[in-house]
A protein has these predicted regions:
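Conserved N-terminal structural module of periplasmic/extracytoplasmic solute-binding proteins
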Residues: 5-11, 15-116, 132, 349, ...
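Structural recognition of the beta-strand scaffold that forms the well-ordered cores
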Residues: 42-45, 73-75, 99-103, 156-159, ...
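Extracytoplasmic/periplasmic substrate-binding proteins
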Residues: 51-59, 108-110, 217, 223-224, ...
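Extracytoplasmic/periplasmic substrate-recognition and gating elements
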Residues: 66-68, 91-94, 299-369, 422, ...
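Short helices/loops that flank or line small-molecule/ion binding pockets
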Residues: 83-97, 113-114, 173, 197-202, ...
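Hinge/lid segment of periplasmic solute-binding proteins
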Residues: 102-165, 303-314
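Helix-loop-helix "hinge/cap" segment bordering the ligand-binding cleft or interdomain interface
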Residues: 124, 131-134, 144-217, 229-262, ...
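Long, aromatic- and glycine/proline-rich binding clefts that accommodate carbohydrate-like moieties
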Residues: 356-426, 454
C-alpha cells in the first residue's frame, strides 16, 4: 500500500482525466468510443496503484490495448473525499460511470455488502470461473469473505496479502532474548497478549519499548475480534475491542512504548531507531515493510540506519490490516474486457500474471517484492529481502493470511474506529475515566450514524 496522493494532487488528476469529455450522462451505460475509435473504460481509484497495474496489462496485451483505453479518476481518501465522489458517479450511471472501481478495507463492505453493494457485478458475470480460480490461486478466505455480497456472489477480490506479522529489530532481539530467530521470537512474543507483555517487561528492563504506540496493536485487536461494530443495526463493543482500553493503558503505565500516534513523525522516527527509546517492533502486513518502514529506516542498504536489521514472525494473535478490493459495475457494457483485467490482477497465478511479477519484484523498476493474494504464487516465489536480513517473508505471510478473519468488518469501520481510538487515547492520557471514554464513544456513534446505541 503506497502513500496516498495529496487531495490537491488527486483532484488535479481528476480534472485532467475527466475534462476531455463533457458529454451529458444518460440513464444507462453505453459503449463509449473515443476519438481514437477505442472503447473507453472508466477506472476509479484512490491511489495510482491499480491504474498503474492496468497500464501494465495494456502494455503486455497490445491486442487488448488496440481496442480499449482508460479514463482514470484518482481521488485520495484524505478527508473522506473518495467515497462521496464514487457514490455519486455510481448512482448517476451513464457513459461516465465507473467500469472498474477500488475500495479499501476501511470501507470496502459498503461496496460489497452494504449500501452501495447494488452497483457491483458478480465476478462470474465478468466471465471469471470464480470458484475454481479462487481454489487454484489459494486466495485467503478472509479476502473472499469480504468480497462476497449478501447473495453469496463474489463481487470483489484483492491483489495484496494483508495478513499481519510481528516485524521486529534483530539487534534488539539478540540483546534481550539472545536470538533473532523468527521461530524462537514468535514463541517469546506469543501466542496471546500475556506472553507479549512478558516480553515487553524484559525489553523494558533493558531500556527498550516493545512497540511505538498503542496504534501498533490496534489492528491486531480490531481484526481478531469475534464481532464487528454493528450487528443487526446495533452498536456492539466486542470484548476483545473493549480490552484495547486495558492493553493501551498497560502499555502507557509501564512505559512499554513511546506513546506515538501512527502516521505521525514520532512513529516514523522509531523506525530508524531515533525515538525517545529504541523500539522492538511493529505489527503489520508486507506493505508496511515495503512502503512505510523501509522508506523511514534511515538507509537504503545494509549498515545504513536500521536497514537489514529487521525480521518477521507470527504475531501474538492473527489479524489483517488494509488491502484494496477491485469491483466492477454491473451496468457496464464492457464486462468481458474488465473481467480480463480483474482476473489478471487478482486471480492469475501464472508467471504472466500481475501476482507473480509483484511477488518476485519484476513488476516495476524498483524491484520491490510484495506479499500477494495468491498463496499459490507465494509458494512458487522467492520472498527473500535484504531489508529482512535475507529472510523469506513469504514463509510467514502465507500462514498469516489463513489466521486473518474477514467476518468482523462493517461499512462504518473507518468512522467508528476513529471515534474509538480517540476515546482510548483520552482514557490513557488521564483526560477521561474508562466509563467516560466508553460513554463518549457511544454518544459519538449515536450522534453521527443511523444505528441503535444502548
Amino acid at each position: 500500500m503506497k502513500k496516498l496522493l495529496s487531495t490537491c494532487a488527486a483532484l488535479s488528476i481528476l480534472l485532467t482525466f475527466t475534462a476531455c469529455d463533457n458529454s451529458s450522462n444518460s440513464n444507462s451505460s453505453s459503449n463509449k468510443k473515443s476519438s481514437s475509435g477505442k472503447t473507453t473504460l472508466n477506472i476509479w481509484a484512490f491511489t495510482d496503484e491499480v491504474p498503474g497495474m492496468i497500464d501494465k496489462y495494456m502494455e503486455l496485451h497490445p491486442d487488448f490495448a488496440k481496442k480499449y483505453e482508460c479514463n482514470t479518476t484518482i481521488i485520495a481518501t484524505t478527508d473522506g473525499a473518495y467515497q462521496p465522489a464514487l457514490d455519486q458517479a455510481l448512482a448517476a450511471g451513464g457513459k461516465d460511470a465507473p467500469d472498474i472501481y477500488c475500495a479499501e478495507a476501511a470501507f470496502v463492505l459498503k461496496y460489497t455488502q452494504g449500501d452501495a453493494a447494488k452497483y457491483a457485478a458478480s465476478y462470474s458475470d465478468l466471465g471469471i470461473d470464480v470458484e475454481n480460480e479462487i481454489k487454484a490461486a489459494d486466495i485467503a478466505q478472509y479476502s473472499v469473505d469480504i468480497g462476497t455480497n449478501p447473495d453469496g456472489d463474489v463481487v470483489g477480490l484483492g491483489y495484496q496479502a494483508t495478513g499481519g506479522a510481528f516485524i521486529y529489530r534483530r539487534s534488539i532481539a539478540k540483546d534481550v532474548f539472545g536470538t533473532d530467530d523468527p521461530a524462537k521470537i514468535k514463541e517469546i512474543v506469543g501466542p496471546g497478549w500475556d506472553k507479549f507483555f512478558d516480553a515487553a517487561d524484559k525489553l523494558a528492563d533493558k531500556g527498550y519499548g516493545i512497540v511505538s504506540g498503542d496504534g501498533d496493536i490496534w489492528h491486531a485487536v480490531e481484526n481478531s475480534s469475534d464481532s464487528g461494530w454493528i450487528v443487526d443495526n446495533k452498536l456492539v463493543i466486542d470484548p476483545l475491542r473493549e480490552e484495547f482500553l486495558d492493553l493501551s493503558m498497560k502499555l502507557k503505565e509501564n512505559n512499554y512504548h513511546n506513546d506515538t500516534e501512527d502516521w505521525k513523525d514520532a512513529w516514523f522516527a522509531d523506525m530508524k531507531g531515533e525515538g525517545d527509546k529504541e523500539i522492538f517492533g511493529f505489527f503489520g502486513p508486507a506493505w508496511l515493510i515495503n512502503y512505510t518502514i523501509a522508506p523511514n529506516c534511515g538507509g537504503e542498504k545494509v549498515g545504513e540506519g536500521t536497514y537489514g536489521d529487521w525480521a518477521v514472525c507470527e504475531p501474538p494473535i492473527g489479524f489483517f490490516w488494509g488491502g484494496t478490493w477491485l469491483l466492477a459495475n454491473k451496468d457496464s457494457d464492457n464486462k468481458e474486457a474488465i473481467g480480463e483485467i480483474i482476473d489478471w490482477i487478482t486471480l492469475n497465478c501464472t508467471e504472466d500474471g500481475l501476482q507473480y511479477m509483484w511477488a518476485n519484484g519484476t513488476y516495476n523498476e524498483s524491484g520491490t517484492k510484495d506479499a500477494v493474494a495468491s498463496g499459490t504464487v507465494m509458494e512458487m516465489s522467492d520472498g527473500s529481502l535484504d531489508f529482512l536480513g535475507g529472510q523469506n517473508m513469504f514463509d510467514v505471510f502465507i500462514p498469516a493470511n489463513q489466521f486473518a478473519n474477514g467476518k468482523n468488518l462493517t461499512q462504518y469501520d473507518e468512522t467508528i474506529n476513529k471515534y474509538w481510538r480517540d476515546q482510548v487515547r483520552q482514557y490513557t492520557s488521564g483526560q477521561k475515566s474508562r466509563k467516560e471514554a466508553i460513554d463518549a464513544f457511544k454518544q459519538n456513534v449515536a450522534d453521527n450514524l443511523d444505528v441503535t446505541v444502548k
